[in-house]
Amino acid sequence: MEKKLLGIAILFVTVVSVLAGDPNVPTCLCEEPTLLGRKVIVSQETKDKIEEAVQAITDKDEISGRGFSIFGGHPAFKECGKYECRTVTSEDSRCYNFFPFHHFPSECPVSVSACEPTFGYTTSNELRIIVQAPKAGFRQCVWQHKCRAYGSNFCQRTGRCTQQRSVVRLVTYDLEKGVFFCENVRTCCGCPCRS
């Protein structure tokens, strides 16, 4: 019995430590590592619960899914409205080459591909579930930026730039409290883009 309890305690501590100081943090928001099965970190049960919570807001405000881009009267949705999929546009963020490579063009074009992240890390390194509720008519999109590798004239998804880490404000959901938040989530970590 003691061995069984010890095993459960070790498993619990391992899970907590992995989530608290996660060594498997994605390089960028939309790049989900598979080592810990992160692609399925948000279960179907959780997705359904989030869908229901978002639907409750739209029902309360009497807003159809089609008109949900105005985000109703909920403060988290109003504040984080910039990244709603129907209204988001590719931004003018650029990544610049390191000094002293002046002979290369200084800017990389913004990639036109977007993704719909299901989880991310806040600027405090805390794991968050990012709200995606397609059935209720609410989806959040983040554009993938290309960065320049050190000393290279090629724009790609790897390498480094001189700018600070880019962050976006997205609607997140606290499962325990059933509350929506608008929080700063890291977009590019290993390949920072200008925010």
UniProtKB/Swiss-Prot annotation:
GO terms for cellular component: extracellular region. Its main location: secreted. Residues 1-20 form the signal peptide. InterPro entries: Coagulin (IPR000275), Cystine-knot_cytokine (IPR029034). Hemolymph. Keywords: Disulfide bond, Hemolymph clotting, Secreted, Signal. Gene3D superfamilies: Cystine-knot cytokines. Disulfide bonds join 28-188, 30-115, 80-182, 85-141, 95-189, 108-161, 147-191, 155-193. One of its GO terms (biological process) is hemolymph coagulation. It is found in: Secreted. Coagulogen is cleaved after Arg-38 and Arg-66 by a clotting enzyme contained in the hemocyte and activated by a bacterial endotoxin (lipopolysaccharide). This cleavage releases the peptide C and leaves 2 chains of coagulin, A and B, linked by two disulfide bonds. Coagulin molecules interlink to form a gel. Belongs to the coagulin family. Coagulogen is a gel-forming protein of hemolymph; it hinders the spread of invaders by immobilizing them. This is Coagulogen. It comes from Limulus polyphemus.
